[in-house]
Amino acid sequence: MSTLAFLSPNGAEDVAVARSPMEGKAKAAGARFEVQGGWNVAVEYPGQDRVGQTAGFTDASHLRKLELQGDDVPGELGEAKREGDAWICQLTPTRALLLGGDHAAPPYAVDVTTCFAALTIFGPQAREVIARFCALDLRPQVAPPGSFRPGSIARQPGMIVVEDEQRFLLLFGWAVAEYVWTVVDDAARSLDGGPVGWGALQNNA
């Protein structure tokens, strides 16, 4: 099924708006949406200021994701290298993911944005939230900022980028996104956390 929804207000020219597979969950949680970069993005939730003091999570599925292939792909295994406002994460010696950013894509890049859904979990208890559904060792001395860890997330294949000491980007299959949201939401709420809008996340960057 296509991820694009078409809007035709007042008979105007059709505008394609891409939507996250977790949009339904976000709506049910009271999200307010704005169209940003062609995506319908959840930017605010009721009570999110309180949530951000413990552990918040936000839908980051709209981040651009490109797969780079070749004998000289950048990066090192196990590391996430910061390049401007993007991350480069090497999957194998010949494959890497470029996450985020708005620079021109290399001609050999494959757009895999809608192959991977994404959630960012942040806050003082972010590691504790993740530990409730993921066995990857994310202790600071083992996985400092700039680490890249493929593994199981909520019993699904996934990857984690350690963006900062209290901020983690989780990537997982588009098709299982609603299930992963439910698992993460349960874990966060058990610690008095919950969903946070994309705008608030940027303010905490």
List PLM regions with ranges:
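Basic, glycine/lysine-rich polyanion-binding surfaces/domains
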Residues: 1-205
